[in-house]
């Protein structure tokens, strides 16, 4: 039977030996937010185009080579692509989180749930801050257990005794462009930004 949820532990992102949060915090200018949908539906968490590379469910892990439950969805996008809050909420954790690499976990109310954004290259929020749906919180990267630039996105819901990750299902794909910018302009800007970065950065 296809499992639609899996128990998950706390993200525990934060200080780590040898890791300096300021080395990845607001290194580049923060992009403009996108319009939300009033928190009626999960907003697609990436500005611009992205390809779904791994769905929620059992999969052969590309690094460890074993069948493991994949507790979220993976979206491939160029490194540095802006990542937005899928719902309004409060930042629970922001920092280095084991296999998730540089990651953010947000908590949302009514109904209570959490969203997780993993393998980031840059952060724009810190624990305790509040964010609005569509606000840029980080950038796509390839940190942690990752085979290339992508966003690992999870939806977590409370269950007796803890939290479970659930299939996030369909995401709102409508407001994908930054306020005042069309999709083509945004993609050209992302391309120019990637060309200006020094090799290996």
Which residues fall in each region the model found?
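Polar/charged, compositionally biased leader and regulatory segments
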Residues: 3-55, 177-201
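Short glycine/threonine/proline-enriched tight-turn/helix- or strand-capping micro-motif at secondary-structure
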Residues: 32-34, 54-84
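Envelope-exposed proteins and targeting segments
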Residues: 48-50, 69-71, 79, 87, ...
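Residue-level recognition of beta-strand microenvironments
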Residues: 55, 94-95, 123, 140-143
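Short, acidic/hydrophobic/Gly-rich beta-strand patch recurrent on exposed beta strands
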Residues: 64-67, 74-75, 103-109, 118, ...
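Short, well-structured beta-strand-loop connectors
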Residues: 82-90, 125-140
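Zn2+-dependent peptidoglycan hydrolase active-site motif and core
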Residues: 86-121
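Conserved, short, structured surface segments that act as functional micro-motifs
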Residues: 102-108, 129-186
